[in-house]
Amino acid sequence: MRNIALTFLGCFTILAACSNSDDAEKPVAPVPTGDVTIYATTNSLTRDLTRDAVNFSSKDNLAPTSITLDPTEQYQTMDGFGAAITGATCFNLLQMQPTDRHDFLTETFSDNSGFGFSYIRISIGCSDFSLSEYTCCDTKGIENFALQSEEKNYILPILKEILSINPSIKIIAAPWTCPLWMKVKSLEDLTPLTTWTSGQLNPAYYQDYATYFVKWVQAFKAEGIDIYAVTPQNEPLNHGNSASMYMSWEEQRDFVKTALGPKFKTAGLATKIYAYDHNYDYSDIATEKNYPGKMYEDAAASQYLTGAAYHNYGGNREELLNMHKAYP
């Protein structure tokens, strides 16, 4: 069955909920138990991820809202929930007192004593929430690949702390841009483009860029961090992000089937590849409709794909159902 992954994108905004070490300790409330566990937050924050539990019942319900379950009708399995961990996230977390930070991360990621977040999304190189714009190979030549200070000083320490709390966390990664020396203005105009925003990947560098992915996954592995999955490009139809790169479905198909997929296979990487990674509406570009579906229809590309990633910033989430029905 073809998986569909819904990517949660954004900075880790629940940092606003972190505690201060000077606050008085709050009494530990008993954990409610029941058939269903409910976490609820209200606009007024009278409930702030408050945990409750309810039991199934076949009796008439006097409550204003009822949820009726039909066990004979099943849909896709929900693998988990999570958040983006960016350079800015990690920088701010490291400003906290170590005990406060650990308590906060435990509350967020622990299966036993927290909310049990099970996924993390990080960037390969910089993102729109990084401390600076960079890739891991800013000097021309793939032999110059190296993890950068933002990763070594901020992202890796926080990921290691999270993994010490919940070792089963799955990490999904995506680049916002390739190294600038691999960029061109467009595929029609192969003029080099030395700006972080927009541009396209020069096909002449497909193999080097695939090697870049391999080296990045291996570098994190050397730090004890497994990368569960990658996408070839964050928001491939977005020309205007702080760091961005346009990648049509044809480009992504060709990159995956001729470079990224084979390089992962040769390197023996278990890291999965998800297609697309953008909005439900495909930015209203007619030629990009059904972006991942068109990639699935190419057998040479689809053999390397696990599924597709979507963002919730545009269009209708019904597109997930459409894709699942068309490409089960």
Regions inferred by a protein language model and the residue ranges of each:
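Bacterial Sec-dependent N-terminal signal peptides
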Residues: 13-33
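N-terminal zymogen propeptides
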Residues: 29-59
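Residue-level signal for beta-strand positions within conserved beta-sheet cores that form or flank
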Residues: 34, 79, 167, 269-271
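N-terminal catalytic cores of secreted or lumenal carbohydrate-active enzymes
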Residues: 49-227, 248, 258
